[in-house]
A protein has these predicted regions:
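Short beta-strand-to-loop acidic/aromatic patch adjacent to the donor-nucleotide binding site
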Residues: 97-106
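Active-site-proximal specificity loops/subdomain of glycosyltransferases
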Residues: 50-97
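C-terminal catalytic/acceptor-binding lobe
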Residues: 184-286
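Short, acidic, metal-binding catalytic loop of nucleotide-sugar glycosyltransferases
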Residues: 27-36
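Conserved glycosyltransferase catalytic-site signature
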Residues: 77-85, 107, 190-198
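Short beta-strand/loop segment that forms part of the nucleotide-sugar
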Residues: 35-47, 67-70
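N-proximal low-complexity "stem/linker" segments adjacent to membrane-targeting elements
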Residues: 1-23
Length: 286
């Protein structure tokens, strides 16, 4: 029987460095989504000091949890598929939330409308493309697991970034059931989560009300939507910051924009400071 508190959303966050930025993310999530929780995975290659410090954070913030299992979580190790599926399974077993939101330790929330908006669909996931060549292809061809997995799909391997994907627990259960027996438990030397999870999504997507988008966008580049406004900005975060500082969250919602990624892991990075000052949160431990 589950004895944990239940939340609207639980954010899945692999972490490996910078305790002060981890706490900054905790404060950011709790301020913008106060009815939500965080599940951390700690990289197995981290120092014991880092592990101890993250446990200090967990003990201070009662909405933070740590996945018991630890794996190497470097981006191209291949273990992130396993990590995310184990995290989904932990959430399901503990029946801890209505929704799961996949993000990373260099992401920040920017739109407080997320907790209400997320109930509009069962899954938010960008429609992936297919993979036939290019980066990582040689490593993929050495991964017999994924080659066997895609045979029933006509050997089609799909690819997309999964940060900003979100789903309810029923959808998460389908990912767990589909992938838990086939995910790589070795270093396959490519970002397996960008292939296994999107390919699984293509198998199940038509069973659910889904929105073809991620709720998280790159902050350090200019995408086609922002570029279309011809504002002369060099980064999405410059455009986004003006919207946030003017509390124009309806504008962000029209763009399906709720968090941004690739924020530098420096506590005094200007974008972090401006968000802290605007939303009124600060670290209390690190």
């Amino acid at each position: 029987m589950n004895s944990l508190k239940r939340y609207k959303i639980i954010f899945l966050v692999p972490i490996f460095e910078r305790e002060d930025c981890v706490e900054d993310l905790i404060q950011n999530i709790h301020t913008i989504c106060p009815n939500s929780a965080i599940l951390f995975h700690i990289n197995s290659n981290c120092s014991q000091t880092f592990v101890d410090n993250i446990n200090k954070l967990k003990n201070h913030y009662d909405f933070c949890y740590i996945l018991p299992e630890k794996y190497p979580s470097e981006w191209a190790s291949g273990f992130l598929t396993n990590i995310y599926i184990q995290m989904m399974n932990w959430c399901i077993e503990n029946d801890i939330s209505d929704y799961i939101y996949i993000t990373h330790s260099n992401s920040l929330l920017i739109n407080p409308k997320l907790e209400s908006f997320i109930y509009s669909h069962e899954i938010f996931f960008p429609l992936p493309g297919t993979k036939h060549s290019g980066d990582w292809w040689e490593k993929i061809l050495l991964d017999q697991n994924i080659l066997d997995y895609v045979k029933p799909l006509g050997d089609m391997i799909y690819v997309t970034s999964i940060e900003g994907a979100a789903m309810n627990l029923k959808v998460a259960q389908h990912f767990v059931d589909d992938l838990i027996k086939v995910i790589p438990n070795i270093n396959v030397e490519y970002p397996s989560e960008e292939y296994y999870i999107p390919t699984s999504f293509m198998k199940i997507k038509d069973r659910y009300r889904y929105m073809n988008c991620a709720l998280e966008r790159w902050g350090h580049t200019v995408d086609h939507v922002v570029n279309g406004y011809k504002l002369g900005v060099s980064k999405n975060e410059e455009y986004i910051l003006n919207i946030v500082l003017n509390n124009q969250f309806d504008v962000l919602s029209k763009l399906n924009l709720y968090s941004i990624k690739k924020i530098e892991r420096k506590y005094n990075y200007p974008f972090r400071e401006l968000l802290r000052n605007h939303f009124g949160y600060n670290n209390v431990i690190f």
